[in-house]
UniProtKB/Swiss-Prot annotation:
It comes from Xenopus tropicalis. The lineage of its organism: Eukaryota, Metazoa, Chordata, Craniata, Vertebrata. It comes from the Eukaryota. Residues 509-571 are annotated as: Disordered. The keyword Cytoplasm applies. This is Dihydropyrimidinase-related protein 3. GO terms for molecular function: hydrolase activity, acting on carbon-nitrogen (but not peptide) bonds. Gene3D superfamilies: Metal-dependent hydrolases, Urease, subunit C, domain 1. Residues 516-529 have a biased composition (Polar residues). Belongs to the metallo-dependent hydrolases superfamily. Hydantoinase/dihydropyrimidinase family.
Amino acid sequence: MSYQGKKNIPRITSDRLLIKGGRIVNDDQSFYADIYMEDGLIKQIGDNLIVPGGVKTIEANGKMVIPGGIDVHTHLQMPYRGMTTVDDFFQGTKAALAGGTTMIVDHVIPEPEASLTEAFEKWREWADGKTCCDYSLHVDITHWNDSVKQEVEALVKQKGVNSFMVYMAYKDLYQMSNTELYEVFTFLGGLGAIAQVHAENGDIIAQEQNRMLELGITGPEGHVLSRPEELEAEAVFRAITIASQTNCPLYVTKVMSKSSVDLISQARKKGYVVFGEPITASLGTDGTHYWSKNWAKAAAFVTSPPLSPDPTTPDYINSLLASGDLQVTGSAHATFSTAQKAIGKDNFTLIPEGTNGIEERMSVIWDKAVATGKMDENQFVAVTSTNAAKIFNLYPRKGRIAVGSDSDLVIWDPDAVKIVSAKSHHSAAEYNIFEGMELRGAPLVVICQGKIMMEDGTLHVTQGTGRFIPCSPFPDYVYKRIKARTKMAELHAVPRGMYDGPVYDLASTPKAGTPAGSTKGSPTKQTAPVRNLHHSGFSLAGNQGDESGVRSASRRIVAPPGGRSNITSLS
């Protein structure tokens, strides 16, 4: 039976609010003005506003007023091997609000062969009963057939879902073949949906995991050793290539390495419609912790793709986030207790994957990118809120301070300093991967649906008051270019006369013949040069190898200072 929505859940009674003396910061401009809110919407913006009586006034005192944050990647109340993450939809959204995030987009993960629609309705029921901020849902495609196609189409047209994630990893569970990826991307492009991808080479990971265990490496360090960044980069390159062939917009989740960031950056410079999503963990910390002598600490960092062991990676990713090469940020918040993580104490492949970050996301970005001078305040709003709203067709209802937009606002103090601690955070997780980190920038007041949710460090939240926000297909921000390319990319056969020459008679050839050059015996001399089909000059930068007719000399790939060389390149 289809889930019918909320029943007898307390609703927020929206307050009439007036924010005075604030500096409004959108993604494209900043200016001083007052803001009047009523019935959960922004009604007036300007100076000397005429407002009705009974209005609660908040003095911003020149502080920034920004759109509420949108966390585009969460895993709240996620089932895993008979367990559930410790942060359910109430605890998780409570932590989100404490950090300045007023909307989340969670992932629905159906079991393999299970109904996508039934899983979606299960997540709706869980979330409607517990969230205290607004939310939307991505749906993960964990298998592919004609029945799934019908469900995907119904979710887009009837249920308010416009984004679906596929997996290139987790062999024999969720992993899809290249053919399936091609079919999924083609289908989603026709529906006006966004194809999200978890990019890792699952086949090689499975082999490397076995190799590590055979070597006796069973701890968390085995996780990152079996998933080198080349395997993330290769999958990103492959996903970009397949999405390009199908003219489908691509959204790469959990961008964790320099190599992957570079590939996305180069693809965008060549005009490919691809978006990259770093997460709180990859922006704020690194993978050196996998070698901690404290098993529980090392296990707390286990997530996939793994954090890079190169300690310069977070700074690099922040730089490309600031430059616009990466567009959105999520937290991939999936918290397990130490006892839950410990089911993999003797085998790293069994450690539940996930880190915290829903509460810390906005402060980490401010501290690492804005306070360091990499990013201005407008770009901060873009990557924490506005771009997400545009990509998922929520703009300008979300991600903007404008008349008619939802009154989801944050008064932000750029000078506030907060020391992260599991003792004071609002997550139920007993360990925080940012423990002891001193972060500049924090919310002073958080307003969601026109109601004050946090003030003076105190939360005022009610379970079950969050709303499901449907996302419609064909967002302009994503699909305007796709539509233009579809018109330009019509293929036509070459008009020519019928061939009336001789045709070779295949019936006269030996049926058991072996193609030349493929026998398994001793190597023989080639009378003419034969192209190695495994050596391709293809590049998304547009350069084709051997254009001059001269074979390229073999090259040795040398690791540059600071890290390994990429196995794939878009330049």
